[in-house]
């Protein structure tokens, strides 16, 4: 069956369908990771996006029950150069194509993903339509009518999934759980399972609360620390969350990742802006301005903190060596810090996992 990817600027790419059928719209973006497609597909941060994988062959190792980053596929569509016809992996339980069909995600193969990525890199991320039923002209028109990611609150659209500490513990299946050292409240803006695993494996008892939990509700739980998760959409739209997080800053140690980093930045008085085509891949070099250390990081974001708006009492700690955008901040006197990238990986390098230990050390210092 024919499938069409149409962009709002009139670009049309025609290929073959796999997965579900129908029509979906979203923001077209690209990911440069060679592996980790299942983690990408199930990452809530990709909600509302049609993702192009630049690696030429996708689906080689199938799908398995262990590599989910949420309970289901989250992307609006999936674009690959070639879908593997045969998958092979000892953990695999299903091929990628049939799994996407069950998940209701439309896929297209047989298109020039290098051309798509280069076009988005030059022209910027844009609205798109992926369809098995519209004409090219109709698909372009559908893309142009799709909502823009800028100004879009997707956190409320995907909803939150509160979890008890016991439910978080159940995510760690491959090793013995360490003793609990600290109680942590984690805000769910679209939290990845591997973040929860990393927090638990670092000695935190984790309770996951909804995105709109109030500062009063969180403080009533008497946590040793607060964590702000990743998530989709425009961080500037989450003004009520900025307010509640601002009310927590200084009262309890705080660590944020990705969208959580952007929310902390807003709560501290900074602003965010939309990147031309975003950072999505597993090989982004980040420099720690305090130590000079370089980490190779996994990233997935379309917005960034504007360095010119960072207040004087906040330090920019990390920058991206590709474009010099802000990758981390820390308050100069209060126990709060955040990073734009994903130290938990899944997929990607594990260089920055030390940040979870730094958070624990911050809490320990605070309690002394």
Located regions from the model:
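Active-site-proximal beta-strand elements of phosphoester/diester hydrolases
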Residues: 183-187, 297-298, 337-341
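Proline-centered loop/turn at the N-terminus of a beta-strand
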Residues: 106, 183, 253-255, 271, ...
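Catalytic beta-strand/loop cores that center a nucleophilic Ser/Cys/Thr
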Residues: 292-334
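Active-site glycine-centered loops adjacent to acidic/histidine catalytic or metal-binding residues
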Residues: 112, 258, 301, 342
